[in-house]
């Protein structure tokens, strides 16, 4: 068994809103041109940040996937059609969207914020028949610590 290392130059780049939100995608979509493709249940993997301004990724739909977002820096705001309200997530917080039969959501990245997002395919043929759900966990409820190297 060999291990392949995919450096930043091998990863796909992405952006929203004319570059207000930037992305580096170790595993992106086929049209993104990255060298690493979806593997097993891991479908998408991206690091996104808003370097200069607050910026919104508009309301858009998902079906089937389970989407985990980790707030690495700053704050983001999340809206979805299940909650029907905006909520704020801060550094260290985690949200999980189980898209199931379908859910639409929007994210607002605040200036200087960063997120890490992973999409899983739990078994798309079954998950398309499950009701969607949303959950968020505050960093204060997670058992973790930061190590400075």
Predicted segments, located by residue:
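Short acidic-glycine-tyrosine-enriched beta hairpin
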Residues: 83-96
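Single conserved hydrophobic/aromatic residue that forms the stacking wall/gate
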Residues: 141-149
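Ligand-binding loop in jelly-roll beta-barrel domains
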Residues: 99-126
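Conserved short histidine dyad/triad with adjacent acidic residue
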Residues: 10, 25-31, 43-62
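Histidine-centered metal-chelating micro-motifs
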Residues: 57, 75-77, 95-96, 100-107
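Glycine- and acidic-residue-biased ligand/ion/polar-headgroup-sensing regions
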Residues: 65-76, 93
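A contiguous pocket-lining binding segment that forms or flanks enzyme active sites
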Residues: 116-142
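A short beta-loop-beta micro-motif enriched in histidine and acidic residues
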Residues: 36-39, 51-67, 82-85
């Amino acid at each position: 068994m060999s291990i392949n290392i995919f450096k930043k130059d091998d990863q796909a780049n992405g952006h929203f809103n004319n570059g207000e939100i930037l992305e580096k995608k170790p595993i992106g979509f086929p049209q993104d041109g990255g060298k690493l493709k979806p593997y097993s249940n891991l479908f998408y993997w991206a690091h996104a940040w808003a370097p200069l301004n607050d910026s919104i990724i508009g309301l858009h739909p998902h079906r089937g996937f389970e989407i985990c977002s980790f707030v690495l820096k700053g704050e983001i705001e999340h809206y979805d059609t299940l909650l029907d309200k905006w909520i704020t997530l801060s550094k260290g917080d985690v949200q999980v969207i189980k898209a199931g039969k379908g859910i639409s959501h929007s994210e607002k990245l605040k200036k200087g914020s960063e997120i890490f997002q992973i999409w899983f395919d739990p078994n798309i043929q079954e998950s398309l028949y499950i009701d969607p759900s949303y959950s968020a966990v505050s960093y204060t409820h997670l058992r973790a610590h930061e190590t400075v190297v």
